[in-house]
Structures are given as C-alpha cells and as structure tokens.
C-alpha cells in the first residue's frame, strides 16, 4: 500500500502500521482514513499529504 508524507512536517503515514494512537488500525489505506483525521505530529488535515515518491 502507498505511504503518504505530510507536506508540512514530513510525518509518513504507513498503512501497514496505521495510527494506533489515534484509533486507526494497521492495514488502513490513506484513502480510508476518517475525514477528520489529522497529522499526529503537526495537526494538519489529509489535504496536506502527498504520496511518497
């Protein structure tokens, strides 16, 4: 699955890991994240993420 990188702080969302601290289970694709999910490092929305090159 595609990893996504926060354009602001560089946090990498890895679908294989998810974001368990914020209730996102491993195996959750970026597109399937809740609309109100934000970067756990800097708090920006999903709109501020780009696919990892």
Curated annotation (Swiss-Prot):
Record flagged with keyword Secreted: no
Cofactor note: Binds 1 Fe(3+) ion per subunit.
InterPro entries per the UniProt record, alphabetical: Rubredoxin (IPR024922), Rubredoxin-like_dom (IPR024934), Rubredoxin_dom (IPR024935), Rubredoxin_ET (IPR050526), Rubredoxin_Fe_BS (IPR018527)
Keywords, alphabetical: Electron transport, Iron, Metal-binding, Transport
Domain Rubredoxin-like, first and last residues per copy: 1-53
An annotated Gene Ontology molecular function: iron ion binding
Known cofactor(s): Fe(3+)
CDD domains (alphabetical): rubredoxin
Biological processes, Gene Ontology terms: alkane catabolic process
Binding, Fe cation: 6, 9, 39, 42
Function, as annotated: Rubredoxin is a small nonheme, iron protein lacking acid-labile sulfide. Its single Fe, chelated to 4 Cys, functions as an electron acceptor and may also stabilize the conformation of the molecule.
Family statement drawn from the similarity comment of this UniProt entry: Belongs to the rubredoxin family.
Name assigned to this protein: Rubredoxin
